[in-house]
A protein has these predicted regions:
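A short helix/loop element that forms part of the nucleotide-sugar donor recognition site in Leloir-type
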Residues: 1-10
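Conserved donor-binding/catalytic core segment of Leloir-type glycosyltransferases
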Residues: 11-27, 33-36, 50
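Nucleotide-activated donor-binding/catalytic signature segment of Leloir-type glycosyltransferases, i.e.
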Residues: 59-83
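Acidic donor-binding loop of glycosyltransferase active sites
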Residues: 89-107, 120
Length: 197
């Protein structure tokens, strides 16, 4: 177990807004940094943006963070797959800001499943296929337009102001069960068996 607050010096009163995944241009992490920068300073002081992962866009995101003079942003680097659950367990809000990039979108986005499994408020874009199945807008999170930084900022504010119940995801057993790895595996096998005959 790694205590993220201790490891990254995050005050106990701060809400942790997290992205976990590869840092690539199509993942939209720069949009998340920009949306975070647009929050009022009194709100930013009560939040910490944790960007967990590594990739070709890491230096661009760090540069953007410096340019916007953001203090409450932490880049963790690569996360051991065995520790992913630990990261999800300790964040308050998970953001998956994927963009349409050179015709690319995230057909499913398993990372969103993990956030749902851990009972987190989730914010994802319409470029993430699983967002249509996993997110009940205003109930357990928000699905926003890809690349729309103002919508992303508003969704973060709504999540922080508890316009949706913080316990909604924990209680939404139906979604958690429906999209668990076990259930998804069973449905995948059923589809393959139907195709193979």
């Amino acid at each position: 177990y790694i205590d993220l607050r201790e490891k990254f010096n995050i005050p106990s009163e701060c809400k942790i807004i997290m992205y976990l995944g590869r840092l690539l241009p199509q993942k939209g992490v720069g949009d998340l940094v920009k949306a975070f920068s647009r929050l009022n300073s009194d709100i930013k002081e009560k939040c910490y943006l944790l960007i967990a992962g590594d990739g070709v866009d890491l230096e661009n995101c760090k540069r953007l963070t410096r340019m916007l003079k953001l203090n409450n942003v932490c880049f963790t680097g690569s996360v051991n797959p065995a520790q992913r659950g630990n990261y999800f367990a300790q964040c308050d809000i998970f953001v998956y800001p994927v963009n349409y990039y050179q015709g690319w979108c995230d057909v499913w986005g398993l990372t969103l499943n993990e956030a749902v499994q851990h009972g987190k408020i989730v914010i994802a874009t319409d470029a993430v296929g699983s967002a249509y199945e996993l997110i009940k807008n205003g109930v357990n999170g928000f699905r926003i337009e890809a690349g729309n930084i103002e919508q992303l900022k508003s969704a973060i504010l709504d999540a922080l102001s508890q316009k949706i119940a913080w316990t909604a995801m924990v209680k939404d057993v139906e979604l958690k069960k429906l999209f668990s790895y076990t259930e998804m595996g069973k449905r995948y096998i059923e589809v393959v068996e139907k195709i193979v005959g």
